Amino acid sequence: MTDNTVWHETLHDQFGQYFAVDNVLYHEKTDHQDLIIFENAAFGRVMALDGVVQTTERDEFIYHEMMTHVPLLAHGHAKHVLIIGGGDGAMLREVSRHKSIETITMVEIDAGVVSFCRQYLPNHNAGSYDDPRFTLVIDDGVNFVNQSHQTFDVIISDCTDPIGPGATLFTSSFYEGCKRCLNPGGIFVAQNGVCFLQQDEAIDSHRKLSHYFGDVSFYQAAIPTYYGGIMTFAWATDNDVLRHLSTEIIAARFHQTHLKCRYYNPAVHTAAFALPQYLQDALSPKEVS
């Protein structure tokens, strides 16, 4: 890969997207993944793993705000948060904005990703790696949730697509481990791809998660970087009230945090759980309300 070329995403065989590469900042295969970080005039710095875009400076705030503030504000009194993946540091950045959080644990399989991102994506982590509440664990996420003695109020799986090393974070073993690590009333969320193009992933996750959690559904956000439509996030908890909280309740909690967001707001929070009919039909009407 050289400067002034075009980088093509390889997630889909029959269609896809490309980025003009203005400047390659880093490109090397780590022990686990093929990682590249380059600059693009429209999206800023772009990071891709194994031919799939993971994040861009231009729109990462949408993904990370929705992955953090939705479960944290729905929970209402979370103190201990676990992030699986998230090596770019942006998920940590958003969680750390909640001053009521007491501990933030991040489990990343590849120490190299953390090092690269601290150097090349500083706006993503915005200094959050230095938060005294933060602990970094270099380990496989499945192993951690099945072996750890720690428990958490919210678990955020900032996983890659279910290919390569990221595939293990879509298995029953991982979901079962997350359930054992959650405190009563806890919430698990995970990225689940663009459901219009990756519907089988949502169906598979829904089926597996339903073995361990009483309330399983999805919520969504429109993120331009992720080609093909609206991004889907898995939602799992045993407290079915949390998914149906009113906008007024969420707004009161949001006001108490003094957060200023660029995408998330209480109305977006409640609207995000309204799923398109094709996804409801795929999951079956009896399973989604």
Curated annotation (Swiss-Prot):
Q: What is its main location?
A: cytoplasm
NCBIfam families on file: MFS_SpdSyn (NF037959), PRK00811.1 (NF002010), speE (TIGR00417)
Q: How does the record describe its quaternary structure?
A: Homodimer or homotetramer.
Any single Pfam family the record assigns to this protein: Spermine_synt_N
What is the official name of this protein in its record? Polyamine aminopropyltransferase
The entry's localization annotation reads: Cytoplasm
* Gene Ontology MF terms: spermidine synthase activity
Gene (name only): speE
A GO biological process of this protein is: spermidine biosynthetic process
User: A single GO CC term, please?
Assistant: cytosol
Q: Which domain of life is it from?
A: Bacteria
Q: Please list the residues that bind spermidine.
A: 64, 88, 158-161
Lineage at the top is: Bacteria, Pseudomonadati, Pseudomonadota, Gammaproteobacteria, Enterobacterales
